[in-house]
Every structure is written in C-alpha cells, then in structure tokens.
Amino acid sequence: LYQRGEPSYDEANAGAMRYLPQRIARKLGETIEQSYGEREGAFLRALLLGDKKYLDEEDASNLSEVGLSHVMAVSGLHCCFLASLIGALMGGRQRKLRCAVTIPLVFLYAFVTGLTPSILRACIMISMGMIAPLLGRDNDSPTSISFALLLILLKNPFAIASISLQLSFSAVAGIIFLTPRLTALARGKHKLLRAAMLSFSTTLGAMVFSTPLACYYFGTLSIVSLLSNLLCLWLVSIVFALGLVSVIVAAAVPQLGAFCALLPALGIRAVLSIAGLLEALPFHAVYFNTAFSVAWLVYVYAIFIACALAKRGKYRYFAAVGLSAASLFAAAKVNALHYERGGLNVVALDVGQGESVLLISEGHAALVDCGSKNSYIDAGAIAADYLRSAGATLDSVVLTHYHEDHANGLAALFARMSASTIYLADIDAGEGDRAGVEA
C-alpha cells in the first residue's frame, strides 16, 4: 500500500509463519504448471493469483480489448467468488460457523495474492456483511464501503493514489447506486431474464463511475464490455471455483492433477475463444488518444445525465443509446478522414524512455521502432491503439537497432495487428539482441 520509510534488514527464515502466504502462492503456481497446459495454466494463474507474466501476448491483449482484463487482476470480484465457493461447499451450516470459516480464508487469500487495496476493500466489506446479521444489524453497503476506505487510508493515506483503489471503490459505488434500480425493472419476470438483468446491471453499475478513470489511466474503453461480461463472467466464476478445487486436489494428490484440470481447461478455452471473437469485431473499443474520443465520452455522459434529470419520456434512454452510437461512428470517421486525405503525418508516440515514431499517409502507416525502457509503458499497445483510432493499415515496421527501448513492444503490437514488411538494420551485435527480435 505504498509504504514509505527507510529499509530495514533482519535475519531471514524461509519457514517463518510470516512467509506462509508466499509459500502457498508458490505451491499453487507450481501445481497449476504441472496440471494444466501452457495456455490454460497461464490464464488460471492470472485468475487465481493475479500473476499475468505467463499469459500469451495475444490472449492478454484480447481480454483487455473486450473489457475482461479485470478477471486477470485479483480484486473484490475474486473474493466474492471465493466466499460463494465456501458458502456452497458448507451448504446449510450455521451462520456463525460459515462466518468463522469464510472470513479467515478470504483474508488469507488476500495475503496470498498481494493484499492490494481493492482486495482489502472486499475483505472488509464481506466481513461486515457476514458479521452484521450476527449482531442483529442490517448490512448497509454505503457504510461498509466508507468504513473500508477509512481503514485503508488510516493505515496509509498515500494509498489514495493507487489506481487499484480508485477503480475498485468507484466500481462498487456504481454498483451500490445503480444496480438495484436496474434489477428492479426485471422484478416479476422470468428467472432467466432476472439473472441476465442482474449480470447486465452489475456490469453497467461497475462501469458508470469507473469508466472515466479507466479511460484516463489506460486510454481505452471497450464498447463490447457489457456483452463480454454477460457472456463470460458466469463462466469465469465456474472456472475460478473448479480451478481452485482442482489445484488443491492436485497439490494433495498429484496423480489426479490432469484429470481434475479437464473441466476448468474447457471453460478457460471457451472464455479465451469468446474474447478472441469479440476482439475481431469492428469498433469493439475506443482509444483516447485524440480529442474526438474525449469529446465523445463527455457527450455520452452529458446526454445520459440529461435523461436521468428529465424523468420523462418512456424511450429517452433508448434515444440516448442511439445518439451515443451515431456520435461514436461520426467521431471515428472524422478522425480517420484526417489521415486518409491529408499529407504525411509524423507522430512521435509518448513511450517514455524509448522510441516509437509513426508515419501515416492516405490510410497507410510505417512504424519506426517500437520500444520503451519504462516497465509500466507498453509501446506496442500504444502504437496499436493509435493506428486503430486513425483507421490506418500498418504496412511496414523499421527497426534502427535492437535494444529494448527500441524493440520490446513488437510482441504486443503483432498480437493485435500484422505488418507486411519488417526492415531490420544490419548493424553490430552490440546494438541489442537481433536474434531475440527475429524470434
């Protein structure tokens, strides 16, 4: 949680109780690696532990593009999955016993996965939700989320700068504010319709306050995120439950690992396939690297706020959706026309300490270098976002040398688009790892 101060050193003991969460995380990761295939294991590792470094570039890009990247970042959603799994396994046991089992396990999971502000928020809210009935009190969500924020900031006020905290609390605030109003519309309807409406309204509620923050920090808004979450979130919850059980069983009895992995692996492949199909749709995402996209987002929020304030007109929200879609197409077309009809546009992309320069003319583009030394900057994603928002085709990539600050973004770039020609500089071996780039 962004702790500050002078570092201190003491004698280490790998078997100490304080390192139990790390040992559990390592054991779970090793068991996943032994029981699952490379692709499925990488996804499950990201889902259960938040460890995304093993994910294939294309899979990670697809999940991010369609609005499913939150399943790879352990958060309150995963705590809810775990609490639901424990409740299902315990059945109709006494409420006190469920509370005594669930709360410690949820907090242990939080420590295993790194105790980020978002997961700590969920642990506090789940604990309050389970303890309140035992004390004869009603669980009040606004009180729970406020108390969670107070505890986190009392421990470390600098946590307010955490993107994880900002997105988590804004998403839950949206769910508390909007979701009950939307689910009420399906009251008295068919059970299947109510379930679909609950999933839709929860996703929409989570987006209403968090979307501006996500667009500001990550520069992307997935237009198909409502659809992707409706199709995949229930499946992800099943994969989480079956995957966690399979890993625990495989850790105890390694011979059963491959068998226990069969069903979760099928679910993982289904989620990745759906993400790949949705990513291939045109206009599946908006990229906030131009003034047109920013103006469009402001316009969308303005018309929906106007609809909420009007309180009249049965079809006003349908009209707002239509206007939002029409204005999106208009903004995208106007932005693309600038690159289709103008002369040569030279764009130095902001990749921190590195180089990435786009040359765009008449809808065609060449990219000179694609890399950054800053670990938090994905040069390939930045280039791909700009090309898609410009509606340009990448014809060629030119590498002037092979150091990471000029070439480490290529994998992410080619996970999202291809280039017909790649020009490699014929220079000394000291100018980076050419063999690694060619691979």
Residue ranges and their predicted role:
Residues M90-C99, P133-T143, A310-R316:
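Membrane-helix interface "capping/anchor" motifs
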Residues S75, S210, H401:
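Conserved G/P- and acidic residue-centered "switch" motifs that form tight phosphate/ATP-binding loops
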Residues L1-C123, M130, S396, A415:
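Aromatic-rich juxtamembrane segments at the membrane interface
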Residues I24, L28, R39-F43, D59, ...:
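Stable alpha-helical elements in mature extracytoplasmic
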Residues L115-Y301:
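Internal transmembrane alpha-helical bundles of multi-pass membrane proteins
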Residues V101-F107, I145-L149, F318-S327:
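Central hydrophobic cores of alpha-helical transmembrane segments
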Residues G76-K96, I126-A132, V172-L182, L242-S246, ...:
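Membrane-interfacial alpha-helical segments at the cytosolic side of multi-pass membrane proteins
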Residues A16, K191-L193, I248-A439:
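Non-globular, low-confidence helical/coil segments that flank catalytic cores
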